[in-house]
Amino acid sequence: VAAWGVMTSRANIQRVLHEFYVYFKSLIQTFTDRGLYPYAGPVELRAHGVDNPAEVLIANAVEPTISGPRPHPDYPERDVIIWFAINNNVDQPLASEFNTRLEEFFLSNYQSYAIVRPEWTKSYAFTADGAYGGAWTNTAILTETFPNTWRDGYPANDNWDFAVATLTALDPHRIFSNSHLDKLFPI
């Protein structure tokens, strides 16, 4: 399952969905015209507000540092996140190319009025020819593009790098790690 979140303003929800629909439909048609069917599954959409510590009912609650729906201090109007889960089988022929092109669309299309973040529990950072259906193989997206959405504009004591340093301090021997997390959270 390839998945991304688009954090935007409530006023832009319809725009986000419309632009996705138009592109997704044209992407499928591009492959179909070549007699190829790299996508065989449903699209799951979810929308909700951004993290709000006041709703937690615990004194001194804070926003999770690397949460997808964490609000951005420079863009308070971006108060919702729409999750797009593309329920595709990675073994489907050309699924990695399809997902790569879709991710490229997300990262380029919405940049003027939204922030795109990965859904941590799903696949992201695609390359058209990588292992695992291309997921987690685009080093630039994995180590720069997505982490920067929690770096730029956030204070040094509450950003991506601070979270990585905290995780490293809590697990200095990398007991709770794997090759993917080692790439995502380098020492």
Report the location of each language-model feature:
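Conserved glycine-rich FAD pyrophosphate-binding loop
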Residues: 1-187
